Structure formats: C-alpha cells, structure tokens
Amino acid sequence: MSEVLPADSGVDTLAVFMASSGTTDVTNRNSPATPPNTLNLRSSHNELLNAEIKHTETKNSTPPKCRKKYALTNIQAAMGLSDPAAQPLLGNGSANIKLVKNGENQLRKAAEQGQQDPNKNLSPTAVINITSEKLEGKEPHPQDSSSCEILPSQPRRTKSFLNYYADLETSARELEQNRGNHHGTAEEKSQPVQGQASTIIGNGDLLLQKPNRPQSSPEDGQVATVSSSPETKKDHPKTGAKTDCALHRIQNLAPSDEESSWTTLSQDSASPSSPDETDIWSDHSFQTDPDLPPGWKRVSDIAGTYYWHIPTGTTQWERPVSIPADLQGSRKGSLSSVTPSPTPENEKQPWSDFAVLNGGKINSDIWKDLHAATVNPDPSLKEFEGATLRYASLKLRNAPHPDDDDSCSINSDPEAKCFAVRSLGWVEMAEEDLAPGKSSVAVNNCIRQLSYCKNDIRDTVGIWGEGKDMYLILENDMLSLVDPMDRSVLHSQPIVSIRVWGVGRDNGRDFAYVARDKDTRILKCHVFRCDTPAKAIATSLHEICSKIMAERKNAKALACSSLQERANVNLDVPLQVDFPTPKTELVQKFHVQYLGMLPVDKPVGMDILNSAIENLMTSSNKEDWLSVNMNVADATVTVISEKNEEEVLVECRVRFLSFMGVGKDVHTFAFIMDTGNQRFECHVFWCEPNAGNVSEAVQAACMLRYQKCLVARPPSQKVRPPPPPADSVTRRVTTNVKRGVLSLIDTLKQKRPVTEMP
C-alpha cells in the first residue's frame, strides 16, 4: 500500500503511479509481463479535461496534413540524449494548461489514424494505458476500475533530471512537514517478484515513493511515451511504432552514472536457454548465411553486398571470420578481467559491456524490438541509414594515406627531388651584381632583405602561392613550384637558365636563385624559406648542372667525330670551315672633358685636326667643358655623360673613324668621323695627365678592326681583276697606295707592338 497526501480544498489532486527504475534489471527478465498497478482518480478534473477535448474536437475536425515519418522522429530521443526544454515543469499554474494541450495533440492523432486517444481518461473510473499496450504489441481491452492501468512514467536518467529529481524530493519533504501527518491510502495490486514506486502529484508538486521490493518488471521501467516536448507530442505513424519502441528501449539501456543499480547487472538470473533468444537467432533474416558469426547480417543493395554487425553497428565489405570456441572463451575471460564488475561512478558502460557483463546475453525483448526496427523500418530511413553507415565505414577503412598519395603524385619520376618550401618573394637585380666576386654578396643581401623585412601580410606581390607552403621539385632539368593541395604548377624555370643560386649565411634554411624573367627579361632573385636545410637544394642543383654539362660535352664530342668522318669523305660542306671563337668585347673607360664638335672639310690631315682644336679652345671656357666617360671598344667609341650614364653624347663606329691624333698640347686629343654624304666632324677632348693612353686605345681598336676585315675576306677568295698593262696609270696608282698603307702599318708597329689577335 502506498500513501497518498490529501489535496487542498480548492485544487483537485491527480494521483499517478509510476514504476520505479532504480533497481530494475533490464537484461534479465524471464517472467511474463504483468500489467502495471493502477489507481482510481479521485478528482473531477477528468470531466473538465473531457469537456476541453470535446470543445477542441469541434474546432479541429480536419486532420493535419500528412508528414513523412522521418520528419516526426525525435532525433535527441533516438540518440539517447536528453532535452532540457522537453522536461516537464510541474507547477500550480501550468498543470491544467499542459493537460489540455496533451489532450488536443492526442485528439489530432486519433482523428488522423482513427484510433482512440491513448492519453485521454475515458471515464473517471476507467483509465487504460493504450500506448503502453501498443508498444508491447497487445490489443487494448477495457478493464474494471480496480484493474485499469495508468501510463507508467519513468524519469530520464540524465544529470539534469537527477538534479531536478533531488529538488522535487526536497520540496516534497517540505510540503509533507507543512501539511502535517495527513495521509491517504490507495490500494494496489502487485506480484511477489515485482517492486513498484508511486508518484503522487498534488497541487503541482511531485512526490516519489521509495520502492517496496528490490526487483521489478522491465515493462514497469519503460520510458513514458507521452512527453511535454513538441517532438514527442506529434503523432507517430503505425509503421514506425516498432522503430520508436526499439529506440526507446536502446535509450533505456544507457547506464546512469548516479545509480549503481543500473550499471551492476546480475549474471545469476540469466537463462542461457531462453526461448525468446533462440527464436531471435533462428529467424530467417539472420540465417541468410549460416556461416556468419553471431550478430552479423549480410545486406545486399544497389552498392553491393556488405556485412553489418548489429550490436555495434559497424559495416564492412570483407566477410567476417568466426572465432573458435577456445579463443572466444579466452576473450571473454580477458574482457571480464579488464572490465570490473562494480563500475565506477564516473564511467558509463557501452553496449558491448552490457553483453559481456551479462555473460554474452542480451534481453530477448530488447532483441525483439531491435530486430523489428531493423527488419521492417521505414524505407526512407533504411536507405539513408544504410548509405550513411556504408559511406562512413568505407571511408574509415579504405581511405588512402595522404603521405602515400603525395609521394605517388609528386615523385612520379624516381630521379625527381621534392622539397617543402615557402616563397618569400623576389628582388630585382642588376647585371653588374652577378659579376664574379659580387654575386655571392648580392644574393645574400636579397635573402636578408626578404627574410628580415616584415612587410604587410596582405602584400603578396611577387610571392609564389601567396606565401603558403608549396613544393619545389627538381625534375627533368626543370625547377617547378607546385601547389600541395591541387598539384597545380605555380611556376616553372629551366635549370639551364638559372644564373646563380645560393644558401643564406644567417639562416641555413633560406634558399635563393637568380634567373631572367621570360616576359620582362629582367633579372630576379627568388628567395624561399625551406622546411629542411637549403643545402640539399643547392647540392641537387649542382648535380643536375654537372649532369647537363656532361651531356653537352658528350654531344659535342659526337658532333666533332661526325665532322671528322665527313672530312675523311672529302665532302666540301660549310661545316668544315673553322669559325673564329667569339670572345667578350674588351671595353676601356677614360675620364676626360669634352670640348665639343666642329665640322671640317677633309677626312684626314694633321693641319685640319690642329686647326679644329685651336678654334674650340679659343671659343669656349674651361668651365663650359663637359665631364664625360670615353668607352673605347673593339668596334665602337662611345662618349657618355658622367652625370647621367644613360645619356650618350657621341657614338662613333670604328669603321667610320677616318683620322685621329694628338694636338700641339699633349692634353688634347681629336678624331675625325665620316657621317656620310661627304660630311666630316672633328671631336676634341682634354685629357689628364696626357692624351697618350686615349690615343693608344683608339689606335688599337682601329688596328683590330682592320685585321678583322682581312680575316673576313682572305686573299685566296678575292676576285682578282685582270692585271693592267705594265705601263698603265692604274698600275702605278695601285702600287703607290699599297706602299702608303704598308708604311703606315710599319709606323704603328714601331710605336707599340700589337697584341696577339685571336
């Protein structure tokens, strides 16, 4: 017998019995199910509820539009999570409103499915829990007032609800102390193997009684099907009843960290010869492949055939292998030794621990509901669940390793070398910086400039890959920068076009190379920060360049051998001609003062040269003379302004220089240039300390030019005209010209010996 508190005079009291879940053994129930204990409602509140429901029925006569079942599924309830917003808040002011809302929602369900409202009290003396019987697969039938059942409500075993549970107990004790020792009694039916707890709602306060017996039926510990949350209020289709029941039972298996009775299972009461369990494993759907281990099921769909382990939910393409009995026994022993029987309070037992702690047995009702939910589920949910599990399982099992993928895609050539780098940008360089002895310092300055200058992070101009990580690959005589994400080539540079490369002096992970841009044709020094010492990149480049030089040397040797073979055959082809080897032009620079230019009448003559020098010196002041640089090369004499190196004042080809000499003053030097159309110009210069060096340089350029002309047209290839008569005027003039040229050459040789010509 349970005690009932008397209600206040102004408010009716609704007394509801709820089965206790504190000591319920979920997985070890072999006795037949018994209906829950019932209690007559002693108040007239049900009549008010019936009136409200009838009033609502007149308004909402048309059922709502049909919805898909998966839209009505409570995701949090299916996953075993608690919704704090969905927990009932029982109070004095909200009890009547909540009951009316529950009645309206159940009326909509009855109108759509043509069934009786499971939560509506049919009469003050007859209350039937239709929902509980429907979940058990039974047909509802009316009973007398003493055996009518009320929907058992079990509190959710979550941390937040347990706190609320404790608050309700505290408030109930205070209410009991305030009201005194007024108690009411209620009759209840119970069996010897079951224990119950009563829940009494009076004036909106909840009082939980302690269980009278240590064990109770699992049916009494089912989760309540009527909730105050909006998701659970919605109607559920008939085809989803088994699925919902299975989900509620699975959620019911989640152990509580506050109640040790839920985590400590009794192995003594397990019946290995339970008829329900044998019926489950002998079902035809699980016997499609008798060679499969227990718990495995073969599933075939459009994607192929795969195997599903029902207790754990894992899927795999490979066929599972049965474990021998001796291994299974050893495995059970090891698991039981690892997992202690008294579970700590701060730990939760997974599904597999329930099976292990219970001797490998799981309650037959749980298997029935789980089997019903998996064999005949909603088609849309089944298709979605299968595809999701299959995709996740295959992704986790067959996903390729990223390192292997990178190595396969990048190192396609076994001789290719890959380095992880990050671009720091580039700096423009001048041609003079790459001269021998200067290139090393210039490259190191570029590395320092880009390594230590902290520019704006958004300024990524000239930085390959916007400063992100990339791969520097040396493959097939090419230096390539590759994006590690999509393998796109950001930049490629032929190794033979790289002028200089080097490693930073301050940081051994800085690498730089200098090459000419293929579009702008300017020299750029590209700098990179490497993940590994940059010496490896420099060594690899050196090896590649050595290989290229060796290949070119071999090709040249083959070409020479082919030329010798052709010479032996006496083939008169142009390839047999020995061309002069080109050499770098030697330029001599002199700092002089430019007096100016004066037109003259004749191209040669010392008197004409001296006359032009005197005229320019008398007509101009020394302050007006320009400081210039005279560059004397083999083919050109160039006069450039000293202030602006890009300003060319005079440019005279040596082939057009007709006369040169030193004036009466040893500081003066002048030359006459033929501009064409019988026009001649005399350019005058003032030299310090004297004009000897300048005159010798120009003289050497003239001699070199003359010898090049002789080499270009040797005497053997000249077309010789017929010799004139011995007494003709032409022969006498030709002889005089030859003598004059030879005497001029002899005079120049006496002044300065000519260097050996190439």
Curated annotation (Swiss-Prot):
Ranges where the WW domain occurs: 290-322
A GO BP entry: negative regulation of transcription by RNA polymerase II
An MF annotation (GO) of this entry: molecular adaptor activity
Keyword tags: Endoplasmic reticulum, Endosome, Golgi apparatus, Phosphoprotein, Repeat
Effect noted on mutating residue 702 to V: Abolishes interaction with APP and gamma-secretase-dependent processing of the APP membrane-anchored C-terminal fragment C83
Cellular compartment(s): Endoplasmic reticulum; Golgi apparatus; Early endosome
Compositional bias ranges of the Polar residues kind: 212-230, 261-275, 331-340
Region annotated Disordered, chain positions: 134-154, 176-195, 206-295, 326-351
In-chain residues carrying the UniProt-annotated modification Phosphoserine: 123, 160, 334, 409, 412
GO CC list: cytoplasm; early endosome; endoplasmic reticulum; Golgi apparatus; growth cone; lamellipodium; membrane; nucleus
The name this protein goes by in its record: Amyloid beta precursor protein binding family B member 2
